[in-house]
Amino acid sequence: MVALLDVNVLIALLDAGHMHHDAATEWLGRHLDEGWASCPLTQNGCIRILSQPAYPNHAPAAEIATRLAEAAQHPAHHFWTDSVSLLTPGRIHWPRLLTGRHVTDAYLLALAVENQGRFVTLDQGVPLAAVQGAQARHLVVLEAATRTRR
């Protein structure tokens, strides 16, 4: 299955100093032949976060965009348009979303389901049951690193 990479996974891949860089790189290396995907939301989020002065290893937005564009040129990359709406009746089981912080995760999971792929994230507690048609195979939560990178 093609893997839609969450913003946090894209950041970990692009920032060699990120505490989850090794875990993200290792996972993608093992699954690259299945393909990976990004979408406007994940691309924008990656550029926004990595270019913020408050981010420890920040860089200018143009530099981050160039690096992300280079990664997206890889033959295994798929670009998924924002083809789903959370407002489509039945797409989201709203009572299963306990907090607003899960809305973006639910959207990206729904996009993965729509594209017959899987959503790969570092986030714990992604509400699988909140997305119509989502099954365990549609979600991969990477194990977080337990040590700080230097």
Regions found by a protein language model. Name each.
Residues 1-38, 50-66, 131-134, 145-149:
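Short, well-structured N-terminal submotif of metal-dependent ribonuclease cores
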Residues 16, 37-44, 66-97:
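Acidic catalytic patch
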Residues 32, 72, 113:
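Anion (oxyanion) recognition and catalysis
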Residues 2, 35-37, 78, 118, ...:
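Proline-centered loop/turn at the N-terminus of a beta-strand
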Residues 85-98, 109-150:
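Acidic, PIN/NYN-like endoribonuclease modules and their adjacent C-terminal/linker elements
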